[in-house]
Amino acid sequence: MNTLPVKQSQLINPIAAPEVPQELQENIILTSLNDVYSWCRLSSLWPLMYGTACCFIEFAAMIGSRFDFDRFGLVPRCSPRQADLLITAGTITMKMAPALVKLYEQMPEPKYVIAMGACTITGGMFSTDSPTAVRGVDKLIPVDIYLPGCPPRPEAIMDAIVKLRKKIGNEHLDERGQLQQTHRFHSVKHGMKSVAPILTGEYLAAPTRQAPPQQLAEALGLPLPALEAIEKEAVERN
């Protein structure tokens, strides 16, 4: 007598953890998209070095074989459109401020800034009597890591990069837009007195500047208004 096989019941969503074959247990990594995104960014920071003073000389030792700047995945770039890290080292003056802001605006998001040296952070020794030094680069662009020193050692630069990598690793994709830094320029006064402009154009508009000197005009044979008036009177009398 032939009997039909009894179909055993099977749970669609079992409580127990699914079994992974042995050949796949060592080839699967479980992670989140946010962790992969942060890992890719912190392992490939491409800096744009904006050196203006003696602090930038420390990068010569940083790039050398003793400290090996490239082992952190840092590849210096010449174009701001290819960089995601801006390192400012040295004094920032009023004349250079627009260029620095333009470089920062040309960098793609997400982008980070390391302020290196006392002159970049507070103006340094130029903060007391210099009429052109900016008292802190954070009044122009937002800063993520402050690196004090005059100048900072290469070990301090490495520590700043490690701290920046930790900050990038703790960021979340959904919170990136809510963690934008506030611009300190709107809340902190620059502390500089406004001075009336020296070149107002009045000197060039003076009557003595409208006509060449008499000696020069006589040497070149140019007609002088005074001589023309005397000659005109002589002609009228005759």
UniProtKB/Swiss-Prot annotation:
Keywords, sorted A to Z: 4Fe-4S, Iron, Iron-sulfur, Membrane, Metal-binding, NAD, NADP, Plastoquinone, Quinone, Thylakoid, Translocase, Transport
Co-factor binding details: Binds 1 [4Fe-4S] cluster.
Residues annotated to bind [4Fe-4S] cluster: C54, C55, C119, C150
Gene3D superfamilies with a match to the protein in the record: 3.40.50.12280
Biological processes, Gene Ontology terms: aerobic respiration; electron transport coupled proton transport; photosynthesis, light reaction
GO MF annotations, alphabetized: 4 iron, 4 sulfur cluster binding; iron ion binding; NADH dehydrogenase (ubiquinone) activity; quinone binding
Compartment(s): Cellular thylakoid membrane
Enzyme nomenclature, EC number: 7.1.1.-
Entry membrane topology: Peripheral membrane protein
InterPro entries xrefs: NADH_UbQ_OxRdtase-like_20kDa, NADH_UQ_OxRdtase_20Kd_su
Primary location class: membrane
Cofactor(s) the protein requires to work: [4Fe-4S] cluster
Family, per entry: Belongs to the complex I 20 kDa subunit family.
Subunit description: NDH-1 can be composed of about 15 different subunits; different subcomplexes with different compositions have been identified which probably have different functions.
UniProt cross-references to NCBIfam families, sorted A to Z: nuoB_fam, PRK06411.1
Protein role: NDH-1 shuttles electrons from an unknown electron donor, via FMN and iron-sulfur (Fe-S) centers, to quinones in the respiratory and/or the photosynthetic chain. The immediate electron acceptor for the enzyme in this species is believed to be plastoquinone. Couples the redox reaction to proton translocation, and thus conserves the redox energy in a proton gradient. Cyanobacterial NDH-1 also plays a role in inorganic carbon-concentration.
Protein name, per record: NAD(P)H-quinone oxidoreductase subunit K 1
